[in-house]
Curated annotation (Swiss-Prot):
Its main location: nucleus. Residues 532-586, 1566-1662 are annotated as: Disordered. It comes from the Eukaryota. Residues 532-542, 552-568, 1601-1613 have a biased composition (Basic and acidic residues). Keywords: Cell membrane, Chromosome, Cytoplasm, DNA recombination, Meiosis, Membrane, Nucleus. This is Protein SHORTAGE IN CHIASMATA 1 homolog. The gene is SHOC1.
Amino acid sequence: MRTRFLATDYFAPSSSSAAGKALALEFFSFPSLPVPALPPDPHFLPFTSADELPAATVADDGLGPLPIASALSDFLAAVIPQALPVPTVPAADEVLDDFLYDRGGYGEDFSSWEFGAFRIPKASEGYGVINREKDEKGEGSRSDGLEISSVMKRWEQLKELRFEVVEVDLLMALQEDIASFGEEESGGGVTLLLRVPDMKIHLDFIDIETDIKIRYQSDLPESVYQVEKVPVKDNDGNGHSSLREDCCLEIAALDHGAVIPRLEVSRNSWELDDCLTETDRYGVFDNVVRHLDEAQIQHSVFKSTEFLRSTDMDMLTFVCEDAPCHDIQVDKPAEIKAAVEMDVVRINGNILLEKNSALYPLKPDGTCSDLPCSILLEEVQIIDFPSDNVFKMLVQSETNKMNISDEIFKDDFDPARRLYESMVSCELALVDDTFRSLPTPILNDDIAVRSRVPPIQEILCSLKPHPLSASDGIYLDWHLLLEGPCNREICCSYASMVEEAKTCHLSSELQRSCQSTSVFVSDFLEDFQRSPKLQDEDKHSDIYVPAPLSHDPQKLEATQKCEQEGGTRNHSSMKRPSPEKSSSFPELISHSGDLNFYLNVRSATKSGTNNENTSTLDVPHSEEQALSLSTRAKVDKLIEIHPVSPSNLIQGLIEQIHASYTSALQESTYWRHSFSDEQGLGISKQKLLELITGEGSEGSYNHCEHKDKMELIVLYALKQVAYYLCFFGLHAAHLYISNLTRSLENTPERLKHILWSISEAQRKSERQLFESHPSLSCIETILRSNKQIDQKILIVADRAFWLPLGQKLASMRMTFVEFGQNPATTFVDLVNKTNSTAWVLEELLKSDCILLDNKNIPASFPFDKFGIILEYGGPNKSSTLLSLAPKLDGLPPLHFLYVKVDGKDFPAALVEDNHKDQDLKSTLDKVLLTLQKDLQERMNKMRIVDSLNFIPATNQLQGLQEKRSKHFAADATKELLPDDQPHRLQNLNKKNTFDSHNVVLADEQLHIQQTLSNKPVVNSQCVPTVEKSSSTSSVSANVLKDPQENQSTTDLPSCVKNDCIMPGRLSVPDVVIVVNTGNHGKTMLVSRRSSYQQILALEKGGMQVVERDIDLPVDLILSAAVCLVWYETALFEANELTTSAETSGIKENVENIATNILMSVSFSFTGCIMVFEGEADFLSAVMDSSDSLYTAAASLDMNLQLFFSHTPRSTDEIILNCITNVTSCYKAPLPDIPESESLAESFLTSFPSINPVSAYMLLSSGGSLVEFLSWPHERRIQAVGKYLLSPKIISLFNALCKFGELGESRSVMTECSSVDSDISSAFLQSPRKRKQRSLQACAVPTNKLLFSDSLNQIPGDYAEHAEVFSPSKLRKFSDMDNTIPELPDVFTFDESLNMRSEGFSYQQKKHDVDAIPGNQVINDDFSNGLTPNNQAYNRRTGNMVDTFDLPWQPEFGGTHPSKSTFHTSRPSCSRTHSNPVFSTAFEINDDPGEWNISGGTKQTWKGLAHGGTVDDSYRYDMDNRYHEPRDEIMQHPASSLAFQKLDFGSHATSQGSCWEIDYLRQMSAKRKARQERSRCSNSPGMSIPRMRDSNSKILNPPPKESFRYRGDRDTPSRDQSPSIGTQHYGKGKEGAKAQNRRARKDFNVQPTSHKKRIEPSIDPTWTPIDKRARQKLSFVTYGKEKQSKLVWRNQNSPGVGCGFRKRFREEGT
């Protein structure tokens, strides 16, 4: 690989021939020059010293004759090396110079790692070789005696010449005894001076153990001759270098400053030494500071590229094609400030400076470089391979491109060493990381490597199989596990095998081992129906596995005694083993003897005993057991015990309560005087109650003040809430602590924290994230296993557990009834309940299970009528039914559950103690006696004690309401059971007569309660409900047909009833009012202090008032669908334009409200209440312009109601009445709305269809916001169904999320797009098709009267012509569904923006109309609340006040129905299909319990206000039930149109009412009249077949004339201005004939012709000429505007009547 120079030094003789060459030189004949003597030098190479030779000189004054001797002297001085003397050890500060002596002193192109610079003196300077030593004191004299001045003189005259780096045969040099040199001269490296003057070579070593790699710089020239330097380890203590190997010690002894290239691999490790000594550290910094500012860099006269003159190619690109380009950084000395901040680091004796994990080198002159060192510390693993394998793998490697013959590797190691030396030679251009890892590569030979599979196979083959046991033959066939899911046939076959196995006889020892026998179960059959054969054999089962009574020592002893003294059983004769054999028997039971080991396939193998989870009890039923246990008869029942441990959540809450309890004990001064911590924790609640009341304190009551009693109350409350939380779950605990905090005037902080924690957990439980109590999961498993075989179930539990238990039963769709809640079954004597059996038998026909109180078990209860009994003991570890076993006959199989509180870290003392409910009466009496203050204080005291003793139970009605709301929300389309019918609750608004803090006991003790409190018992007709703060979702599923059976007194205190809520104590409010604090160009209601203070006062009644800055111009948000806007005269005066008439400005403002404000409000609300306040002239002008408001509201599909007021006081009354009526109607559960706006609310309210109330409905729908956005449209509607949120809001929200903003569909108001952005939109169709459809849409006229009448009839051909109502046709125009959804709610129509459904479907609900309570037509509470001035103005405006279905009352005996504030009514233009809208005026003036508001999909709100359900299965058989109308009905215009737009689903009332009969007759008359007019109005001019076949109807926004002032009521009415409506076109032959079989008195029938179509009037009204409209209200766009606006246009203007709204235009099919 050598290309230019050989590494052989011909002038350096070897040790063997040194003497011979010395003699050879003696025979050289040099003229006039003696041969110098060359004695061997023991310290270095044996050459003659150059100082002994005469120096050659050259004259400076011209060239003279040169003798030959002078030339030979110069030649010899130039080519013959000479020995140099050994210098002395340098000073300590020379360490820096020796370590970095070769950096920065050889020119600008030389880096800090450059080696091999040669300095050749001139001929006149002699043959001296100058050392780099800088000792100016003259230490270490030279062998020739030269002075330091001459040496420095020659040094300055040196000339730098650059040659090839000379290789030296180090083996010869290492064999000699080399003296040691100074420890810090060469910086840890080894230097060697050759004969060549001033040439120094560094000996560096590559440490294989630590993988010290050669560092290659980025530039190509430097990479040719640079070799990384590895310094030798240096220690501080001994003052000299310490190396590991002897050869390295010899090399380190060379103290000549020469640098030797790296030629061989050594195994020296590079390790980090300890820190420098104080002396060395001080010397380093002193040298740095002195030389830092004086540093200078010497530059070379030659460029480094001179070494590459022999090559013409770029070796960097030759080795690596994609070599990175690095900029060469100029080495500059660092500033002294930066150097002082650095840390001194010593690595193997080398001193470096560290800053920010970077090492900076020190230069020889003491300066510090600003370029960090490239030192790589890396550990690699070196694996020694045999030489033959190494090179064999190297040759066979695919990456090896070298063709090396086998002759090179004939020797063992030498050839490999030569190859490696050639690879690491400095002549190789290592410019990148190609050769960075120099250790021998590990190349695996895939052919030679042995596979791991054969050894594993050999090991497996060598294993011996386990010997077969005798039990292998009884294993079942396990192939069913390999077939995937088991089918029913296979499992039934194995069930038969199990049945056959039951006939085996067990030994007496197995039967006697009570505590250690596993239960015989077959878990792999638990998911399948039990076979009839198995069920039949269960009734005659002869297998009895007796066990002691659970955890009761007395019962256990009695059972054992009975076993020893009892006679033989009928089915077998058992021997009684000794106790020793019984105790040792469990240890002898193996897996082979356990049948569960073989049969339990699906639930994994269970072995040993399992008496903690399930035990079997065989309890006698003979009456003689109470007297004597000598004999007992066979009992045919199996008892299983299921211990339940508290969940982690409950344990965490109890630990929190325990921590609060402990801290209260430590902070209480009273307890420090009375009890220790342990005594305070173990004190019973009865003792705490005595200390609170002051009775039985025995002297400790003397220093118990009011503050101490409050601490006692907190301690008692903590113990009680922990008790309910542990044994009855989150619901009971939440009810208890909520009731207690409302009873206290100042709630302690400890109770607030506990209340907040339990409330958070309870809300999560309502979302079904986890169970409120862990026993509910076990109960569900037991009930589902028995529900499949259709068995009646009896559940015995404490009343406090009925609430979560009822929720679980309701979620399982199981009906149940609570025993003892019916007044007919309430008796004082619990034993003599003679009618309990009959009542149970009657209820079992309608219910799946019965709930029974474990404290109230009658002796005559028919237990044998149930297939299974489930008893929840809670804190009781023994069964209550088993204690009554002698009195119970035929007890069916029993499942007993109890809570197991045994645990090391569980505070059992905090939850186990509980006072008896029987002591409640005596405690209340003692409270009144111990308190000696005034009556008010005694009452407060009694309330506190009552709250402390509050039992969190529920009643039947609460369960019924919550179950219904959740059931309809979860599955609105599921058909209810026939027995699941609601019942009318007629007196729900009556006030309860209980004291707000009285405690209600069990209904069997109501007479005692009445005696104590001297207060009447609640009437059975009035069923109090639990307040909403209980936060229960679904409880009871039982349904009773008799209203008397569904109403009873309850054991709840009346403090939790709706009518007796304490002010400001409602944790979850029933009503939320949102007040707008924004500024929208008008005076906001919040700015009027008097009005806003009255709204804030509503919080005392349980309402919540929340302030929000809303972008909409509304003042109040009463619900998710209704808002209230208030205007005063000042607004209109400020905004009045400069006109001559004052009213013109008011009209313009009213039109602005109609076109802009109503438009923006219509996206978020379906109902709006406007209150105008001002003087009479102002109100008159607003009334005259109110037609535009009604027309705009009807066009926008909104319900609008106007109120007018003179004074602020009357305005406040109107607003408060509106709040009361709206909130009383909206009885859906409300979400928890915080006081401050959240980020999610801000995001949702940015959508135009979402307001703050509906935003939190979406957020409380059961998932996070991200999950809600990922749900489909149907899932979203179903999720918010329980809140009765309008599906229109969700549909618009989905449309905005789906389509975004596209093209001309962008709205300038909402910055969102409409449904026209869809790809199927008509706007995206071709102009020709769009124009054709537009002409078709405008060409079909409409008949308003025809459609108004059609609302009162169900077409009989819906099923035959279902294709008429295709989705594409339903979406054409805004008012298309006026003909469809306003049909009776017997039919419901699903309609949304998502048109994936095909066709038009309707569904008939199967409910009874009797379930809906009767309507009270007029309620004067709201109307009488208005001032007389308001009534006068309302009478003046008549039907202009409301677009709702205004109150109407038919004639009864000729009397005029004028009790309402509004005397007339007009048709409402709102659509009342399945979307919930704001109640009509008819409903708002009706009884709150009878309001009719659409409530979600396929239901209305009728009856939901007080727990009733929607039942709209009214059968409208028009042809059979309708009769001819009376003529007098048609005389009054108001009566003719009173029910024209009413929601039929809301009028399914009791049969036989007078107004209903008149109503049905009127509908029949309208139906027949419409049929006649339909035949007369058919236009024969419409001859296009496609148009004639089309059954689509197009509705324009209602005309303004329908809202005009009617004038005097007695004036004969006749409509003079026909309006454009919708007309039916028929195909019959009589289509062109005018048939007027029943002409109405107030309607003129005009004959039709082919040339002109006669438009019938909307209704028989008469409009004064001065009040008739000369313009029409339509939607238009101006210029480039993309948002249409509602403006008045002339009737003759083009396009009037065809300006349909953009969002309802026809989309392409």
